[in-house]
Swiss-Prot record:
It comes from the Bacteria. It holds the Pfam family eIF-1a. It is found in: Cytoplasm. GO terms for molecular function: ribosome binding; rRNA binding; translation initiation factor activity. Belongs to the IF-1 family. One of the essential components for the initiation of protein synthesis. Stabilizes the binding of IF-2 and IF-3 on the 30S subunit to which N-formylmethionyl-tRNA(fMet) subsequently binds. Helps modulate mRNA selection, yielding the 30S pre-initiation complex (PIC). Upon addition of the 50S ribosomal subunit IF-1, IF-2 and IF-3 are released leaving the mature 70S translation initiation complex. It comes from Methylibium petroleiphilum (strain ATCC BAA-1232 / LMG 22953 / PM1). InterPro entries: NA-bd_OB-fold (IPR012340), RNA-binding_domain_S1_IF1 (IPR006196), TIF_IF1 (IPR004368). Signal peptide: none annotated. This is Translation initiation factor IF-1.
Length: 72
């Protein structure tokens, strides 16, 4: 799958779950499970409930997402 196939959306963290997984509410109202991307994990970027994030969804599974950016 190429990078052109991903769907980028904005969302807000609702709650922390185990294993660096988060429940994210997207701007269209859907709630998905999101995990931190490798670069964010490598640079120890902390994510807390209430943070605004950018997530990437694949067209194959719209219930899971990858968190790629945390807004300041």
């Amino acid at each position: 799958m190429s990078k052109d196939d991903v769907i980028q959306m904005q969302g807000e963290i609702l709650e922390n779950l185990p294993n660096a997984t988060f429940r994210v509410k997207l701007e269209n109202g859907h709630v998905v499970l999101g995990h931190i991307s490798g670069k964010m994990r490598m640079h120890y970027i902390r994510i807390l409930p209430g943070d605004k994030v950018t997530v990437e969804l694949t067209p194959y599974d719209l219930s899971r997402a990858r968190i790629v950016f945390r807004a300041k």
